[in-house]
Amino acid sequence: MPDIGVAPHRAPSIESRESWTAACLTLAILSISYGSPLLVVVGLKPIQEALGTDRSVIALAGALVWVGTGLGGILMGWLADRIGIRFTASIGAVMMALGLAVSSTGSVWALYVGHGLLIGLLGNGAIYAPLVVYVTRWFDRRRGSALALISSGQYIAGIVWPSVFERGITLYGWQTTMLAYAAVVLAVILPLTLLCLRPSPEPLAAHAMSGDPRKGATVLGMNANLVLALICIAAFFCCIPMAVPNGHLVAFCSDLGIAPTHGAAMLSVLLACAFLSRQFWGMLADRVGGLRAVMVGSACQAVAITGFLLTQNEIGLFAVSAAFGLGFSGIIPSYVVAIRELFPSSEAAWRVPTFFFLGMSGMAFGSWLAGMLYDHFGFYAPAFAVGVFFNVANLAVIGFLVARQSSNNAKVLTTATA
């Protein structure tokens, strides 16, 4: 049985101007849709006060968005292969707007149903993972750069939406802000999905031209599903520390006496730095491979999150937030590059969303765990410390996979030159 060790010789590229048009349209859609989990982050304390409950209860709503998005990506990825990305993404936009409307009604259960089921499972679940798979099918040589571009939608959203949400919540309240954002989702995403998205190249044609790994091959000398399981476990571990500052930075700053506007600005700085460095990480993944790029990014994230334990002044936290953004931004796209390098294109519709489900479950668990630890201890240091622990666990798993890949490549090279 063949083994996937080194990348095969690539035939003429499938990439074209249409490939980058598809990537730019996806970037625009994700720049809007990625705002949905940020509204609860920015409005964590006002929503908590309005509903009269614990912080972990509200943080769970944000966590449910990630779990729903991950699980929905598997279901909607399967559906997108059958009815087309245009229709699944349009369904996602409508469900996201409906979820925001339900969440704004002012009860904890409405918040959970709106965020977990409608915004997460049926909303972002129909948009994020299916669009990522859609874009990977337009590229074979610069897939890492393309994924870096579209994933920057998260950081464009992070630059724009926190300040908009903070001002909207201050002036009009969190419920009105949710409804206004729902209107923006419908007004922008629906026309883009219905009128502009075009079918990707046929999977079999892309497979033949790009030298995809063959179905049934072992991966890194192991069963293919075992390798995917290890990648998913690593993703779960690395997304736990990723979620702590992403989900609690504004509330963390408020607890330290830093103005909410400055906390929202700090989150924007974090995501702006992530946006600026994202293309570097994409080029690195194209050059050294997805797994090695993941390991470098995860090591940078571990160093940066440790900084949140070492400083509590505003200037220092701005610097640490910037460093964290620069470090973590390339990790998730590099995982996708690794999966597309190691597995056939025909399996991308379920392998990539499965990875996203575990990664987003890690984001959900990390966001909820940070809120729970805060409720128990009354401050955020334990949450950041636990984040460092899981980051080290991630590095152990990824280090094992990189070692297997290096060993496998050496064996293939020795066989080829014998």
State where each predicted segment sits.
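Extracytoplasmic
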Residues: 21-55, 73-76, 161-162, 245-250
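Hydrophobic core of transmembrane alpha-helices in multi-pass small-molecule transporters
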Residues: 31, 99, 110-126, 236, ...
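Conserved MFS/SLC helix-loop-helix module at the cytosolic interface between two early adjacent transmembrane helices
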Residues: 71-109, 285-288
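C-terminal transmembrane helical hairpin of 12-TM major facilitator-type secondary transporters
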Residues: 262, 268-338, 355
